[in-house]
Swiss-Prot record:
Natural source organism: Acanthamoeba polyphaga mimivirus (APMV)
Superkingdom, natural source: Viruses
Protein name: Uncharacterized protein R97
Length: 279
C-alpha cells in the first residue's frame, strides 16, 4: 500500500485508517487517500459502488461520513419502504410526494387528499395512529401550511361522518344550521327524542352524542338518581330504557309513581303527592 500513500505523516494516516475501519469496517478503501490533517479533505473509494468521494477525515470518522451515493440510494429505499407502510395504514388518504425523510422524529410534509390541507406531522405518530389531518381528524398538534375557509367540511360531509361515527339511526340532523366545526348545531336524539346543541367537532372527534342518559345502563341511571335524591326513593322497579320512557319509582311515603327519567334527575321533580304536600 505504501507506494500509493501520499502523506506528510504516515503514522497519522495509519491511525486514521485504523479508526475508520473500526467505524466503517471494510466498506471503504484508502489506497487513493492523501492524509494531511483532520480538516483537509481527502479521497476515499467506496467498495460497494466504486465511487470515489471527497470528505474530511474528521467527518469520515463520524457515523454520517460515508459514501453519499450509497447513503442516498439507501435513504431512497428506506423512504419507499416508509411510504409503503404509511399506505398500508392510511391508504390513499394522503399525498406523500412532499416527504423528505430524515428520522422518525423530524416532521414531514403531507397533503390530505380529502380537504387539500398541507401539514407537517412526526413520522412516528403517523405510524402509531390513523388520525392526523388537522381538519378532517381535528388534530391541532401539527403545523398547517395552507389553511383557508374552503378547507372546512361541508354540511353533507359532516352528516356523512356523523352517521359513520354514531350509526345511521342514532340522531336526526334535519334541523341543523351548519356553519363550521366550532359553531354549535341542534341535533335530535332518536332514542330519547331530546334535542341538544353540540359543536360538530366534538360530535365527530370524541363521539359525544346525546347529553342525557340514553347511553347509560339501568344500574348507572339508578346511581345518578341516588346521587340526586339520596335514599328518598325506591328504584327496585326501575327498567331504564331511554330518557323519554317513564320509569316506576317508589316514594317511601306515598308509594309507587311513574316519571320520565330526565324529570327525575335533571329537573329534580319529586313525587307528585310530596310536591303538593309541600306547597
Amino acid at each position: 500500500m505504501d507506494k500509493y500513500i501520499r502523506s506528510r505523516d504516515k503514522s497519522n494516516f495509519e491511525k486514521f485508517c485504523r479508526r475508520a475501519r473500526e467505524i466503517h469496517g471494510d466498506k471503504y478503501s484508502y489506497d487513493v487517500s492523501c492524509y494531511v490533517n483532520k480538516i483537509t479533505t481527502t479521497n476515499i473509494k467506496c467498495n460497494s459502488c466504486g465511487e470515489i468521494f471527497t470528505v474530511t477525515p474528521r467527518r469520515h470518522l463520524s457515523i454520517n461520513g460515508g459514501c453519499s451515493n450509497c447513503t442516498s440510494r439507501g435513504g431512497q429505499e428506506y423512504l419507499n419502504k416508509f411510504i409503503r407502510k404509511l399506505t398500508d395504514i392510511h391508504g390513499n388518504k394522503y399525498d406523500y410526494s412532499m416527504i423528505v425523510y430524515k428520522n422518525s422524529k423530524t416532521p414531514i410534509k403531507l397533503k390530505c387528499n380529502q380537504c387539500d390541507i398541507i401539514f407537517e406531522q412526526i413520522p412516528l405518530k403517523l405510524i402509531r395512529s390513523k388520525y392526523h389531518c388537522p381538519v378532517c381528524d381535528f388534530r391541532p398538534d401539527c403545523r398547517i401550511f395552507n389553511y383557508n375557509p374552503k378547507s372546512k367540511i361541508s354540511v353533507d360531509e359532516f352528516i356523512k361522518r356523523a352517521k359513520n361515527k354514531h350509526g345511521d339511526d342514532s340522531y336526526d340532523y334535519s334541523e341543523i344550521n351548519y356553519v363550521d366545526l366550532n359553531t354549535k348545531v341542534s341535533i335530535r336524539c332518536n332514542k330519547c327524542s331530546v334535542q341538544f346543541e353540540q359543536k360538530p367537532r366534538v360530535h365527530l372527534e370524541h363521539g359525544h352524542g346525546c347529553g342525557t342518559f340514553s347511553r347509560y345502563t339501568n344500574n348507572e341511571w339508578i346511581i345518578f338518581a341516588k346521587i340526586t335524591h339520596g335514599d328518598t326513593y325506591d328504584y327496585s322497579r326501575v327498567e331504564f330504557i331511554s330518557s323519554s320512557k317513564p320509569v316506576t319509582i317508589g316514594c317511601k311515603i306515598h308509594g309507587w309513581f311513574v316519571q320520565r327519567p330526565t324529570n327525575h334527575i335533571i329537573s329534580k321533580i319529586p313525587c307528585k303527592k310530596c310536591r303538593v304536600k309541600n306547597q
